[in-house]
Amino acid sequence: AGKEKQKTIWLLFILQAQSLFLTFLIGSFETGSYSNIIAFFEITLQDQQRLTNSYWQNNALFAVFNLISRQTHPSFPQFLASIDAVLIDRLSELALNTNFNTDSQVWIIDNAIYDLNTIYKYLPVWQPTITLALTDVLSTYPYLSEPYLWAVRGVTQNSDCVNLSIGQICLSTTKNSLKAVAFPNTYSFDDGIQVVYTPLSLASIQPLYHALKQVESQFFRLIEILAPVSGDPTDTISMYVYGSLRDYRVYHPFLFDMATNNGGIYIEKDKSFYTYQRTSAESIYTLEELLRHEYVHYLVGRFIIPGMWGQGPVYANERLTWFDEGIAEFLAGSTPKEIRPRKALVSQIQYDGSSRMNVSQIVTAHYGDFKFYRYAGNFFQYLYTYKKDVLRDLIRALRDSNIAAFDSLVTQMSQDMSLNTSYQSYLNSLVLNVNTLTNPVTVAPDLANLSTNDPAVIQPIFRTTSTGHLAKCTTAAFRMNGRFSCRGMITGSLRSSPDWIAAWSELNSGINNLISTLETNGVNNFGSMNCGMGEIYFNKSSNQFYPLALYSCEGPLAFQTPISYSRPTQDQLDFRDTTFGVNSTCFTNPNPTLGTICNSSIATISFPKTATYDEMYRFLNWQFNDLKSEVFMMRPPLYKRMNCGLNSITTVIPNQTTGDKYLTATSTCSL
């Protein structure tokens, strides 16, 4: 009977705990409830075994911890006034109860410390008492353990360092020590543009680096411009890859003040993204898929959308949520020659059955639910397959900061019932063939056995192809992961109209044929080559049109010791070695913080008298973008801070009789 009575009391406390949390959710708090919190903690401490393997009992305890942390705030003065030494003592007892220091129950200790930290923050009168309790925590648990880290957070809320009875504790020092444990290895790629911090081996990271190269090349084919947006500050990217999900959950909040209810996250203002190695039981996505996804976020911010993520009117009301996540999921399926639908996404749609999202729901999706990711990713795949011009227009609108044009396109898609019907049919076909789909798995080239480290060997072989017969090749990056870069113009067939979709498909196929031709060459560097493509321009010839665009290919080089470039001499040589920068002049800016300045005179072709200014400007702007792209792709590490503007645009009419005319302008790039 006594055991039954205890069981009844315990169940009553569980119900009370859940009731307490519900009262918080509806915004009320009864004074009598405070005593129930104390009593709940006391019975927990007296009968700890009842927490073992009990979902409801653990859930109730978590609810009480959650209630305390949320109610301990100036918005809830009644609860603040109720806090006394008894509550602090009970929380301290829970925090110092080493019986809970197991993988399954350490959360109890962590939450108790968290609540003490919260009270410390909002009720200074209790800071001395809580400091003593947290000092005991620091003495009780191992250095850098979960409880230790939470206690460091608590005692250093008012300053980086604090002197305690056990000695000085510093938040920054603890973070540095933890970083050394969490990320013992640092791998630098592309001469420092990409830096990976991780406990994983280099052999594990190399395939991921080469996977990102595939994503990048397809991204450039999609957006058509190979240079960063003006003034973009994200000239490097740091990748923090934790060794496990547990490390991510334990270390990440302490090191970077971020939540971990995600598979990874990119923070543009920090020029960093964070993720972790995972098992198939922990995630349906591989580490490679997550890195591919997050890297697309970096590329979008650097090459499409000006400004920082979340800032500016373009991000208002989560306008870009579907776009950001959709393009990332889509491009995560990149290979050197195509962008493939991913089995991981289509399988989830298969399991959704009839509860699919429609186009209108996709383009108005908000964060808070991951379901739209798979639908947005495959909607991009659909547009890429059947309506590539719409995809182009969406991207151009964002790059031009033309919110009205972007919104108009989204509204049209949202209201187009036939579009949704077609999209759903496309999903049906994907689901029907789901077992033929794959997820990306990249194999790194054998860097130790590459044929050459010299672009002078690469260039003549490249020039044996029809597309690459005028290519110019350079060393794009040095050291272990050296890279070559080869660039040139690719042209398409004469046609009766400037059909962009047909032209893109033709030029894209031409680039893939170039890759296929070279990848079987005896020089094995070409086996891992990736190629991008710039903006397509249509030249008119006898009332017909032929497309042309810049292409840029890059691939691995064997180890090469870095060389130091002489600036501005090298800059001027590089600018003059482009299609439209032959007359460039580079000089050192008198203001040393601005580095080198390169001015390039650009002139369009001659247009007839009837040509409009907009028509001439489109050609001029194409030349300008081509110049920026060609220089940037020569040596991305050298030109990572390149910022260019077009000025002094002038209309020239050399022959007043015919009225033929052209535009001239000066491209000014700070490096």
Predicted feature descriptions by range:
Residues 269-346:
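Zinc-dependent metallopeptidase catalytic helix centered on the HExxH motif
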Residues 201, 205-212, 281-292, 320-325, ...:
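Solvent-exposed, acidic/flexible segments
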Residues 327-335, 347-436:
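Active-site-proximal alpha-helical
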Residues 86-238, 242-271, 359-373, 385, ...:
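Non-catalytic architectural context of zinc metalloproteases
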Residues 404-574, 581, 593:
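Beta/coil-rich, acidic/histidine-enriched accessory regions frequently appended to metallopeptidases
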Residues 220-236, 306-310, 341-344, 391-398:
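Surface-exposed patches in mature extracellular/periplasmic domains of secreted proteins
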Residues 1-166, 363, 367, 435, ...:
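Non-catalytic all-alpha helical scaffold/repeat segments
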Residues 216-223, 294-295, 299-307, 331-336, ...:
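Sec/Tat-exported extracytoplasmic proteins
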